[in-house]
Amino acid sequence: MVDNVYLGNPNLKKANTKIEFSEENIIEFLKCKDDPVYFAKNYVKIVSLDEGLVPFNLYPFQEKLVNNFHNNRFNICKMPRQTGKSTTVVSYLLHYAIFNDSINIGILANKAKIAMDLLGRLQVAYENLPKWMQQMSRRQPKKVRQNRLEY
């Protein structure tokens, strides 16, 4: 098992690690691909200051936001502060990265530290996906430095 982990991180599998998909895994994978809200509710984990690593329980407005992202290419959101927008966006970016081929995702913010925080949240959510859902390429990031994933 130690041979199948990436850079000593037991939450990440190495590239080209063979994973046996059960029929249940395939059904779940297809459900998640078609429904980003289902994916977020069932597979995305976030860090809570009070409880540590917890499942991401979306509020109804967050579900609507994710569905809007999924169904519309362009979105404008006029929303107040501290409503979980960043976490919601991270959950959708993770879905988008896993279930779409040949894509690039940029995380921009008014300060580099904020962009790095969002990238860190994305990394935590990815690391806590089941191994059968992790999509690994040969070029896996070694570390995050100055707003970039370094390979």
Please tell me what each predicted stretch does.
Residues 2-151:
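Phosphate/NTP-binding elements of NTP-utilizing enzymes
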